[in-house]
From Swiss-Prot:
This is Protein LIFEGUARD 2. Expressed in seedlings, roots, leaves, inflorescences and flowers. It is found in: Membrane. It holds the Pfam family Bax1-I. The chain crosses the membrane at residues 41-61, 66-86, 96-116, 121-141, 156-176, 179-199, 213-233. Belongs to the BI1 family. Disruption phenotype: Delayed development of the powdery mildew fungus E.cruciferarum. Increased cell death upon A.alternata f.sp. lycopersici (AAL) toxin treatment. It comes from Arabidopsis thaliana. One of its GO terms (biological process) is regulation of plant organ morphogenesis. Keywords: Brassinosteroid signaling pathway, Developmental protein, Membrane, Plant defense, Transmembrane, Transmembrane helix. It comes from the Eukaryota.
Length: 239
């Protein structure tokens, strides 16, 4: 009985000062978003583990022309699907269908990246990602409760991602060596840590209740990009 009363009082406590909406509704929305993200991460782990374990899959992608073409398609698919996903993210069941395609395609790309990485580096990246994501999420909820706002990070993070994209393009055309890869991985990790805080703050304060798919996509991308950034950094250190 005491626990039920305590939970009810916790649910009625505002998540941030001057909160005008119902805390129960916002908490329900937050739980729904994190449930979707959890399913996405489980699908990603299952698909990526299959790609890593079944050696013939990575061999097909790296040694055949059809495999290379399919790899390019898998890389482009999440980018292509994000356009209709943004447009239909409030339209059920199309939003879930597009989300599934987006998640599976990205999971394949993650799996192929992990297929050429040592198990130790993958494990280190997974542990670091989990610790950082949980820590930053708890911090953002704590900071929001005390009136801190992280909306100002948006323009800076967007500009930083543009710099990363240009740096990646240069790296493809003119490989800059191990040190440059380490610097890239370190900077990318910091940037996506910022995005986790920024998108969690949006989840708490700004997303409408119908934007659960887009909120989940944003945080899922933050987690995956942080993992890949740490993987890049640790792989360069390990080489």
């Amino acid at each position: 009985m005491w626990n039920q009363k305590h939970d009810l009082e916790s649910a009625q406590t505002p998540l941030y000062p001057m909160m005008s909406e119902s805390p129960e509704l916002r908490w329900s929305f937050i739980r729904k978003v994190y449930s979707i993200i959890s399913i996405q991460l489980l699908v990603t782990i299952a698909v990526a583990a299959t790609v890593v374990k079944v050696h013939s899959i990575s061999v097909f992608f790296t040694t055949t022309t059809a495999g290379f073409a399919l790899y390019i398609l898998l890389i482009l698919t999440p980018l292509i699907v994000m356009c209709p996903l943004y447009y239909y993210h409030q339209k059920h069941p199309v939003n879930y269908l597009l989300l599934g395609i987006f998640t599976v395609a990205l999971a394949f790309a993650v799996g192929l990246t992990c297929a050429f990485t040592s198990g130790k580096v993958i494990l280190e990246s997974v542990i670091l990602t989990a610790v950082v994501v949980i820590s930053l999420t708890l911090y953002t909820f704590w900071a929001a409760k005390r009136g801190h706002d992280f909306n100002f990070l948006g323009p800076f993070l967007f500009g930083a991602v543009i710099v990363l994209m240009v740096f990646s393009f240069i790296q493809i055309l003119f490989p800059l060596g191990k040190i440059s890869v380490m610097i890239y991985g370190c900077l990318a990790s910091i940037i996506f840590c910022g995005y986790i805080v920024y998108d969690t703050d949006n989840l708490i304060k700004r997303h409408s209740y119908d934007e659960y798919i887009w909120a989940a996509v944003s945080l899922y991308l933050d987690v995956i990009n942080l993992f890949l950034s740490l993987l890049t950094l640790l792989r360069a250190v390990d080489s």
